Curated annotation (Swiss-Prot):
Belongs to the universal ribosomal protein uL6 family. This is Large ribosomal subunit protein uL6. One of its GO terms (biological process) is cytoplasmic translation. GO terms for cellular component: cytosolic large ribosomal subunit. It comes from Yersinia pestis. Part of the 50S ribosomal subunit.
Length: 177
């Protein structure tokens, strides 16, 4: 059995936590995040910590408590430090540019691809072949990065496409005659 739920989440200075039944909202310098806690989990706030325990009669109580603890810890980190995700464009003529809240991609199609960013997410391009996504919500950052990657996934022969900065693309050997 995992013991993730037994560790409390420490609330740093400058972070405000509001518990309203099963709805919890965490506010910090990077914004405010809200989440509904699973009904099998009981969250208690004591001074500067959040503790988790399963409710009576919940079959999957400890599992849900561990998941809730991990999600709320990510929310606390998000509103204090924020999350970043880096993408690289590999290929001849593959370029990215940011105009406001729209990422403009040239990925070898006959048309440019415009991807609108959701609220709370910012993007910047240090170079034409790099995209850096920043925001407070870890799940939304990952989803936007996955959406951008889905436009042109790295292909296995030359490795061309949109990839995560830390991704290792396994390449195949070309067919031999």
């Amino acid at each position: 059995m995992s013991r993730v739920a037994k560790a409390p989440v420490v609330i740093p200075a400058g972070v405000e936590v509001k518990l309203n039944g099963q709805v919890i909202s965490i506010k910090g310098k990077n914004g405010e995040l809200t989440r509904t806690v699973h009904s099998a989990v009981e969250v208690k706030q004591e001074e500067n910590t959040l503790t988790f325990a399963p409710r009576e009669g919940a079959v999957d109580g400890w599992a849900q408590a561990g998941t809730t603890r991990a999600l709320l810890n990510s929310m606390v980190i998000g509103v204090t430090e924020g999350f970043t995700k880096k993408l690289q464009l590999v290929g001849v003529g593959y370029r990215a540019a940011v105009k406001g809240n729209v990422v403009n991609l040239a990925l070898g199609f006959s048309h440019p691809v415009d991807h609108e960013l959701p609220a709370g997410i910012t993007a910047e391009c240090p170079t034409q072949t790099e995209i850096v996504l920043k925001g407070a919500d870890k799940q939304v950052i990952g989803q936007v990065a996955a959406d951008l990657r889905a436009y042109r996934r790295p292909e296995p022969y030359k490795g061309k496409g949109v990839r995560y900065a830390d991704e290792v693309v396994r390449t195949k050997e070309a067919k031999k005659k």
